[in-house]
C-alpha cells in the first residue's frame, strides 16, 4: 500500500470466518486535498489481497478518510461500511452479498459533507437498529458553514509549479471570499504578488476575483455543509436523519467517542473527547473541550453533565477514547492525548457481571425488564487506531442477552437473572 493512512476497521465482509480490513487513506503528501487511495483488503489465510476494484471501485478515492466503521445498519446480518473524513459526506456503503454499493445520497446524506473526525454506533432510541455518533469540527470556529452556504475548498495547481494549491472560501453578505489572508495566499502562490498589489484591493476581492487571476482549468471543489457533531438517527428504512448534539458538544472538534450505559438505566450515554492544537497561528487552538458526558434522557435527547457531575476534566490535545476492562471486572475510560500522557478514569461501579464477546461474535441483543430491547455491536477498530474491550457492561434491569455471529446466527443465549443469582 502506497498511501498515508489514518483509519483501519476490520470485519468478515466475505463471510469466510476471518477478519478482512478497510484501510482509509488520509492525505497525499504535498498534494492536499487530493483524495489518497483507500483499500479493501481480503484476508486469505493470513495473506491480504487488495480487492477494492472488485468489491467497490469508488472506495479507492472516497476522500481524506479519518474514521470508518463496519456496522449492520439494516439488520440483514451483513456488515455494511460507513466512512467519514475531512470535507467528506458521511459515506454509507451497503453490503449486497457480492459487493458494497454507495447509498449515501439516497439515504438522505447528500448534504452531509463535514470536517468529520470519528464515528461509533449505539442503539440510542430502543428500536433495535444502530444509530451513530459522528464527531465533527464543531461550531466554535471563525467560519460558519451551512448546506445553503457551505465552506468551499477550491484546489488545483493554480500557479503551475507542480504543487496543489488549496483556497478556502467562506460566504459573507451574498459573496464568497478567501478565508486566508493575502500574506498566506502569496506565500503559497507567489504569482499573486504581481496581481494583487495592495491589501485594500485584496479586502475588496471575492474568491472569484482571485481565481480569475489564476489558472483554473483543472480546478476541483470540495465543501463542508455542516460543522456540528451529530447523532445520526437510523430511521430503519434505509434513511438517516442528522440531529446536532447539545451546544456544549460543539465547543471544539470531537475526536474520541464512547457510547456506554454509564448510569445503568439501560440506555447508552455518550462520552466525547477532542480539541485540535495543530492550527494556523491566526486561528489559534481549538481547545475548549475538557471531556464531556451526555446523559441519554430518551427520545434522542441528551443532557450535558458538568465536569463536577461527570468527573471528567481532561486538558490537552485529546485523541482516542476507549473503554477497558479492569482486573476487578469493572471498566475504565482511557483517553490518549497528542504529545501527552494517557488519562484513565474509572466508570461508576456496576456490581454486575461483565459479559465478554467470544471469537466470531459481532453483536448482542439485550432484553430488559419491561420488554424493551437494545442492540449492541462489537467492532474491530475504532478512532485513531484504537479499540475498546470486547465486553458488555450490564444494567440491573437486563434480563437476557442473545449473541450473534457475522451471519446472523445466534451463538448463545444467557439468562442474566440467573447469572446475577450466582454472584
Where are these regions (language model features)?
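Surface-exposed loop and turn segments in beta-propeller and other repeat-based domains
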Residues: 53-59, 106-110, 169-195, 230, ...
